[in-house]
A protein has these predicted regions:
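Acidic catalytic loop of the alpha/beta-hydrolase fold
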Residues: 130, 152-157, 185-186
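Conserved serine/cysteine hydrolase catalytic core
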Residues: 128-145
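Gly/Ala-rich beta-loop-alpha elbow adjacent to hydrolase catalytic centers
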Residues: 98-103, 107
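Short beta-strand/loop motif that positions the catalytic acidic residue
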Residues: 147-150
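C-terminal catalytic histidine-bearing segment of alpha/beta-hydrolase fold enzymes
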Residues: 160-214
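Serine-hydrolase catalytic machinery in alpha/beta-hydrolase-like enzymes
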Residues: 1-94
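A conserved short beta-strand
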Residues: 116-128
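Active-site signature of alpha/beta-hydrolase-fold catalytic machinery across serine-
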Residues: 34, 109-113
């Protein structure tokens, strides 16, 4: 990835759990970087910039209102993120994902293709891609911990996408689902409190893959 913002300087990252953060459609890495201070400080957070220019911002693949996608775009961006993770993962005790909006679609696609690679996943105000090729490639030996946060009245994610997302998450993950009334298509302070508790429990607690103080 060409542009990455880190929560810690390089000399403080070794041995820490890594949280890879993926922004939404038409946004950029700065949206995720603003959240660093609201997440457990034991993590090294990395906010990645999507490779496609979308208006004044960036994205991971082109979308329309119905969330129709070009699978070649999806795989291109997915491979770019996998390549970047490969370049840094040896420095870290575990890898987890955090995706907002389209970033949640990216995070779940990464999870579907390499489920054993990720300790936990957070998906906020987003969706899971409905794609036969991805469905055929899935191979989950265990249910990974997944936090799904949203507003039931979010008008950006259509009902069909939400229904598919809910069904997929219940089938394939160890799901923690929370809703936040009046939040809209955004991220709330209360939601970040719950996300932090989830990450502490599934990644930082004693006996987990990674340990540390929040």
């Amino acid at each position: 990835m060409e542009t990455v913002v880190w929560s810690k300087p390089e000399h403080e990252r070794a041995g820490t759990p890594l949280l890879v953060m993926l922004h939404g459609y038409g946004r950029d890495e700065s949206r995720m970087a603003k959240l660093f201070g609201s997440l457990p400080s034991a993590f090294t957070c990395s906010a990645l910039r999507g490779p496609k220019e979308i208006g004044d911002g960036y994205g991971w693949f082109l979308l329309d209102y119905f969330l129709t996608h070009d699978f070649a775009d999806v795989i291109s961006s997915t491979n770019a993120v996998f390549g970047w993770i490969e370049s840094v993962k040896a420095q870290h005790s575990s890898i987890s994902l955090f995706g907002y909006s389209q970033g949640m679609a990216m995070a779940t696609t990464l999870l579907r293709l390499r489920p054993a690679q990720f300790r936990a996943v957070v998906g906020l105000s987003g969706f899971v891609l409905e794609n036969e090729l991805l469905a055929m490639s899935e191979s989950f030996e265990a249910r990974p911990p997944f936090f799904w946060g949203r507003d039931r009245d979010d008008v950006v994610i259509n009902d069909a996408a939400t229904e598919h997302t809910e069904a997929w998450l219940h089938e394939h993950t160890q799901l923690t689902a929370r809703t936040y009334p009046a939040m809209g298509h955004s991220i709330s302070a209360a939601e970040l409190v719950d996300v932090s508790a989830f990450l502490r429990h599934y990644v930082l607690r004693p006996g987990g893959v990674a340990q540390g103080a929040a």
